[in-house]
Structures are given as structure tokens and as C-alpha cells.
């Protein structure tokens, strides 16, 4: 799948996961990290008020406070200063590719939600190893149980909302959750926007 453009690939994200990667990108730049990692993305998704990941955390009885502490510690271990170079990590692109496979072939969906992303990570050895390195709490997740019961586990999530999946039937364009706007995400100077006060504060 290496020949698939980023615009096409990231255009498959639903509103929640797309906004999550936007926030992760801004967060990464403001921290001065070298690349946008899965760690940034998961951290930002969990910073939201609710979503698939929150319901999965509760279902498998992860310690949310310890998880948050572990993710913060993992962020602090990341190398800083890319010397002007800034990009997505290979793990982010691989996670989206694998999530798209699970999303379409396993669940018959047109947009990747947070649960699809986590299922894909858990079923890809290298990505799973990276997840466990972020926090031992992720070791409580059972890959097959999550994959088999995902829809029931995340039932009621804001990602069920029609507005979160509306992009699936919308024409590709700058106002859709995906489409060509996905490519623009990596060409906008978010650091400059932050300096000019055009970005909302990210916690």
C-alpha cells in the first residue's frame, strides 16, 4: 500500500480520528518533537471528553490515571529537535493502513474510527510492541475480544454520531473530514500559526 497518497489514506479517517491527528501534529510541533508518533495521536484522542478509546479503556478496566501518567512519561522520553525536518512516523502511516483494512473488510465501514485504529494496532506485532512500550496498562487489552465485540464495546460513543461519519457520503473537498484537506495538514506551518495565536491551546 506504499503507493497510496497520504491525502487518500488520511481521508479515510472519521471526524474524531482526523481531528485527533490534526491535534497530534500541532502538539508535536509545539513540543519540538521530531515526528508525529502514534503516542501523540493516542494521547490526543484520550484528551478528548469521550470517544471509542475511552469506552475501550473502561471495558477492559485499564487504570485511566496511570495510563495518562505513563503516556506523559513516554512523551517526555521522545527525542526533541528535528533540525527543521518534520514528518509522520512510519508507525502512524502503517496504523492507518492496517486500520483501513480492518475497517472495511472486518466491519464494512467507510471511515476509520478510534476502535478500528486500536484493533489494527493490537493485530500488528510491531505496532502492538510500541503500544506496550507506552504503558503496561495497554497489556490489559485483549486483541481478539476487542475485535470480536468492538461494536458492542464502543456502543454509544460520539463516534457513532451521524455527523462523525457524514464524510463517508460527502464529496471529497476542503470541507469534508477527509479528502484533499488531509494533505494540507502536512503543508501548513502550524508552528507559525501557534506563534500568531491562531491555534487553540492544546493540553
Where are these regions (language model features)?
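Histone-fold recognition with a strong bias for associated Lys/Arg-rich disordered tails
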Residues: 1-203
